[in-house]
Design a protein with these regions (language model features):
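Membrane-interface helix-loop junctions and terminal tails of multi-pass membrane proteins
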Residues: 1-247
Length: 247
């Protein structure tokens, strides 16, 4: 599997399962309606586990532009690959969100509240305060990326090659990373919905705005959209700088 395709496919799978549980909890007349935050955070952790297991051997399973930036700043990933990885991740997020809509189309139609429908695509804060919201995303992503540096190696041996290649996160322990995302969601996610991943938010938000906004009568809330993009990039950069400084 090509590394770029792996990032696309893995991110699409991540969003299908992750935003899928949000739709199951938030939309009307689903079997999981109103089952709560614990269900959402747990399923997101499982989604991370599944996506990482599938794509780890092929691309390092970044599945997150902030992780890609952080690993590159750490010096464990080629800057030449960064644009392609990020593009693949964002497009994967768009496709995953479209699949969620197809799966839950009737339930979207049965739901009138705009905020509930938008939540199935992208994040929004519980209390809108942009500086604090930005700090929340920075801190959450800092924890994610900094701990990932301790959980995984820097290199990966690609199929068909004999040498270790600095292509991504390496031979990844998917379960610890999933538990890490679960912990972030439970502890820090209640403020902004813990995007901690620009592709997780921007990709589905683009799908909503470009293809589904009129059908769902739901706006993409572009006024907030910069927070779950800028915040994770800052958090990842700080994690890389701090890790390099102390190691």
């Amino acid at each position: 599997m090509n590394a770029y395709f792996a990032e696309f496919f893995g991110t699409a799978l991540l969003i299908l399962l992750g935003n899928g549980v949000v739709a199951n909890v938030c939309l009307n007349k689903t079997k999981g309606q109103s089952s709560g935050w614990i269900v959402i955070t747990t399923a997101w952790a499982f989604a991370v586990y599944v996506a990482v297991v599938v794509t780890g051997p092929y691309s390092g399973a970044h599945l997150n532009p902030a992780v890609t930036l952080g690993v590159a700043m750490k010096g464990a990933f080629s800057w030449e690959l960064v644009p392609g990885y990020i593009a693949a991740q964002v497009v994967g997020g768009m496709v995953g969100a479209l699949l969620v809509y197809i799966m839950y189309k009737d339930h979207f139609a049965a739901t009138e509240e705009e905020g509930l429908k938008r939540a199935c695509f992208c994040t929004e804060p519980a209390i809108r305060n942009y500086p604090i919201n930005l700090v929340n995303e920075i801190v959450g992503t800092f924890v994610l990326v900094f701990v990932i540096f301790y959980l995984v190696g820097a290199n990966i041996t690609l199929p068909g090659t004999a040498e270790s290649t600095p292509i991504g996160l390496g031979s990844i322990g998917a379960l610890p990373v999933a538990i890490l995302v679960w912990a972030i969601g439970l502890s820090l996610g209640g403020t902004t919905g813990y995007a901690i991943n620009p592709a997780r938010d921007l990709g589905p938000r683009l799908t909503l705005a470009l293809f589904l906004g009129g059908t769902l009568k739901t706006k993409a809330d572009w006024g907030y959209s910069w927070v779950p993009v800028v915040g994770p990039f800052i958090g990842a950069a700080l994690a890389a700088v701090f890790y390099n400084a102390i190691m």
